[in-house]
Amino acid sequence: MLIIPAIDLKDGACVRLRQGRMDDSTVFSDDPVAMAARWVEAGCRRLHLVDLNGAFEGQPINGEVVTAIARRYPDLPIQIGGGIRSLETIEHYVKAGVGYVIIGTKAVKQPEFVGEACRAFPGKVIVGLDARDGFVATDGWAEVSSVQVVDLARRFEADGVSAIVYTDIAKDGMMQGCNVEATAALAAATRIPVIASGGIHDLGDIRKLLDARAPGIVGAITGRAIYEGTLDVAEAQALCDGFKG
């Protein structure tokens, strides 16, 4: 399982939100490229970037920062989400050297777009499913749909999606523990690899994910915990590498 540091971008800075609220953010750095360097030096093998402005605007807003990070670390897989709602945007990021694009809102509102994206950019597409009480949320978590997470995930199995990033909104940014049960259930219900996100606080939470022994859980995204020092990236990755499940 990969430990994937998150860099959330708002107005060009590296921030973290609580439960997806743009008015409840903490600025951790005004230099996201330097922050990326910090996690690379800690030994991370993938980075998770989110264009928060883009998620709310429906188009890339912090694209220059994303491109700068991708060009500085061409051998590091980077996944980017937030405002990706057209093939043109995906093409822009792929050409910039980004490894994966995360389709969120558009995957819920127009599921057939995921298939189009996978055909145009095979191996490059991740679907981001954000949920509240098992139902998918969209538009930067501002709207909660009537669509069940598991039902939507299964729909994408035939498209060739590389992974699903599953976020429990109630947990995100709160550091009260990952929703292991829901994440493991999703991994068991679909053939698509699942990346856990939201609520990870410390090594105990990483152990709980590992102890779930769900082979479909291939990664864990962490943000506030690594910025506030309750989780060490290198230590967490070493735990995952040494786990015998």
Curated annotation (Swiss-Prot):
Q: Which residues participate directly in catalysis?
A: 8, 130
Q: Which GO terms describe its biological process?
A: L-histidine biosynthetic process; L-tryptophan biosynthetic process
EC number(s) given by UniProt? 5.3.1.16
- Give the molecular function GO annotations: 1-(5-phosphoribosyl)-5-[(5-phosphoribosylamino)methylideneamino]imidazole-4-carboxamide isomerase activity
Keyword annotations: Amino-acid biosynthesis, Cytoplasm, Histidine biosynthesis, Isomerase
- Entry's InterPro entries? Aldolase_TIM, His_biosynth, HisA_bact_arch, Isoase_HisA-like, Isoase_HisA-like_bact, RibuloseP-bd_barrel
Where is the protein localized? Answer: Cytoplasm
Query: Catalysed reaction(s)?
Result: 1-(5-phospho-beta-D-ribosyl)-5-[(5-phospho-beta-D-ribosylamino)methylideneamino]imidazole-4-carboxamide = 5-[(5-phospho-1-deoxy-D-ribulos-1-ylimino)methylamino]-1-(5-phospho-beta-D-ribosyl)imidazole-4-carboxamide
User: Pathway, per UniProt?
Assistant: Amino-acid biosynthesis; L-histidine biosynthesis; L-histidine from 5-phospho-alpha-D-ribose 1-diphosphate: step 4/9
* A UniProt-annotated Pfam family: His_biosynth
Superkingdom as given in the UniProt entry: Bacteria
Give the family, as the similarity comment puts it: Belongs to the HisA/HisF family.
Entry protein name: 1-(5-phosphoribosyl)-5-[(5-phosphoribosylamino)methylideneamino] imidazole-4-carboxamide isomerase
Source organism phylogeny? Bacteria, Pseudomonadati, Pseudomonadota, Gammaproteobacteria, Pseudomonadales
Gene from which this protein is expressed = hisA
